[in-house]
Amino acid sequence: MNLPTKITVLRLVLTVILIILLCFPFYDVGIQFPTYNVLGGISLQYIIAGVIFIVASLTDFVDGYLARKNNQITDTGKMLDAIADKALVNSVLIILAGQNMISAIIPVIVVLRDIVVNAIKMEAAGKGKVVAAIGSGKLKTATLMVGTTLALFCNAPFEHWGIYVDDILLFVACILSIISAVQYFNINKELIFPKKAK
């Protein structure tokens, strides 16, 4: 296993830690996180989760950079990278929606988009074609990561001024999700629905 793949695996491990941190009933077992009354009040639980999410998100850029720089791009690495990306962002979005910290429509749109795009990629792979990433998809991922980070930090410092930057970014990411899904379909529609020879 090369270094970029190890970094990708680290992202998966951090995702599991995040899920446990956000879902485990610490209060029920006598563990209570302090809340810091700074810019609206943030629980230490979410501060830690936010820091872990930032580190995990950065590994997404680091593993790709190292793989390209050192010519260590492998099929296993690409597969794990895609799984790690979806697991990190989608799991946190679903948890935050379940805790009423973000709108439930956000993970619904993002997850449905991923299902559609993955179906297109699988269809293409079955016909020997690799579907390249597109600009709107990359922008969607970056916007999602920033918006999710802000949501974990309870929209600080913008919450203090009543500006819901986390919600704005996440809804922009939803729009980009839809746009990128449509673009993926348009680019690959002839592959999905080949024209029959007359």
Where are the regions that the model predicts?
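Alpha-helical transmembrane bundles and membrane-interface segments of multipass inner-membrane proteins
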Residues: 1-198
